[in-house]
Amino acid sequence: MKQSKLLIPTLREMPSDAQVISHALMVRAGYVRQVSAGIYAYLPLANRTIEKFKTIMREEFEKIGAVEMLAPALLTADLWRESGRYETYGEDLYKLKNRDNSDFILGPTHEETFTTLVRNAVKSYKQLPLNLYQIQSKYRDEKRPRNGLLRTREFIMKDGYSFHHNYEDLDVTYEDYRQAYEAIFTRAGLDFKGIIGDGGAMGGKDSQEFMAITPARTDLDRWVVLDKSIASMDDIPKEVLEEIKAELAAWMISGEDTIAYSTESSYAANLEMATNEYKPSSKVAAEDALVEVETPHCKTIDEVAAFLSVDETQTIKTLLFVADNEPVVALLVGNDHINTVKLKNYLAADFLEPASEEEARAFFGAGFGSLGPVNLAQGSRIVADRKVQNLTNAVAGANKDGFHVTGVNPGRDFQAEYVDIREVKEGEMSPDGHGVLQFARGIEVGHIFKLGTRYSDSMGATILDENGRAVPIVMGCYGIGVSRILSAVIEQHARLFVNKTPKGDYRYAWGINFPKELAPFDVHLITVNVKDQVAQDLTAKLEADLMAKGYDVLTDDRNERVGSKFSDSDLIGLPIRVTVGKKAAEGIVEIKIKATGDSIEVNAENLIETLEILTKEH
């Protein structure tokens, strides 16, 4: 492919509105362009990478018997009313009307559509299982699109749906998808973890998320690639190294999710779902009587603890939530933080939100800062974190402004439902007892769910079982954020390329180091002087030879300065660069491996053989 024929609008500078490196490089390297807020055009390079990823997906899904189809993106609202999601999905749902004033939506997901198709076509358990998927643009009216392709209003997604006559059959397909996802993300060159996830708006029960890890850019050996002009990091002056470190740190670490994972086992979970090892403790101290004490101007746990000279771990944090229009009191040990996802899941609530100051005062008789679990109205629902039951003689709000109560003892002074509703902390023991929890940032690139009968129940999707009884179809759901993959790969494979000029100056610039499986082309073939006919002829021969051996070749045939060509090549990030330069008449070309910065000169006749050796090594 001739570069002069492609739309690759590279920029000389990083875009000023980009906060994460993947967004900046996709724009600067000419992969994408924003059409409007949260809506992007995928230019030829990005489209080629996405198509390569689609090929990987299709190959792996064929192995597990998944069949591709295509459903409409424009959906009637009636289907979503059947499932109940039209009213509950929220403001992110694009709603529109046609000329007949009928309600439609632009699909963010397609559970209802696939359920309807199968409901109308499948009548017997003998027709199951079915394993269907599509690759399609989805739509979500994001309030604040940001970070390039990571949070957009239109995005490309692979969504798959499986249909079964029982849960045992679903378990088999769910495991098939889990293994297929691992194979897909491994082939794509991603550093990822499969973690325990939350079903969220999808309505799933069991679920697993696949997160591309986005580590901090502190390891110079990982993030910096040295040109052959620099032997090692030790040769770079200290002041230049500090500049490089500052440049690495200047870009925000992307990843809207925090992952908690064990240092010694396979345990990993989204922070929203992560738990830790818990061991109940027996009370050894005698229970004191309740004593009301004045705590003037103390509104926070740390202020109360300091005023009463107690540790924060001896205090009870009392919060009020409204769950599906019903008040729920949540209790935590004072130095812990509430995990609202855990609480919402435990309550099986559709809506959960913190109560207002006015609602709290109406319920407790006091404002924030003085709330507590003692002497609440009969029938009040109290959900306490499991650690609370280990407390003896704790401090809690007295439900009276400016007062607290000491000597509070769970069981004696209040009754509660005990469950894990706290946010875990880094360094705590893993729940499996092996290793401690560490945190990392991550980008969600895939998610699989066991939907069960969530949609078949609400939409009447039934089959006749072995005994001729009508039973609901059991479903699974499997998604991959296709356009997000491009961002995730660049976040992990962006590199700062450093070289030394003949004058001894050090230069550094960002570029992409694409893994070969997803690179838009395999080889960047550059002619230094397009007016040199010998070089042109050699370039044409090498291009033909490479293509005959199965290489995708991008040939830079532009009449541009060589410095501009090399700069664009570093930005675009193809794995191999072959330069036809001043030694073309001698039949000598230069090979440069992008991942390492290594370069060698070879006879053009030996190019293919040399590339085969080098690509095996790297």
From Swiss-Prot:
Sample GO molecular function, one term: aminoacyl-tRNA deacylase activity
Reactions catalysed: tRNA(Pro) + L-proline + ATP = L-prolyl-tRNA(Pro) + AMP + diphosphate
Any Pfam family hit: HGTP_anticodon
PROSITE patterns, A to Z: AA_TRNA_LIGASE_II (PS50862)
Organism: Streptococcus pyogenes serotype M18 (strain MGAS8232)
InterPro entries: aa-tRNA-synt_IIb, aa-tRNA-synth_II, aa-tRNA-synth_II/BPL/LPL, Anticodon-bd, Anticodon-bd_dom_sf, Pro-tRNA-ligase_IIa, Pro-tRNA-synth_IIa_bac-type, Pro-tRNA-Synthase_IIa_type1
This protein's encoding gene: proS
Lineage of origin: Bacteria, Bacillati, Bacillota, Bacilli, Lactobacillales
Keywords per UniProt: Aminoacyl-tRNA synthetase, ATP-binding, Cytoplasm, Ligase, Nucleotide-binding, Protein biosynthesis
Protein name in the entry: Proline--tRNA ligase
Cell compartments where the protein resides: Cytoplasm
GO terms classed as biological process: prolyl-tRNA aminoacylation
Entries under CDD domains matching the protein: ProRS-INS (cd04334), ProRS_anticodon_short (cd00861)
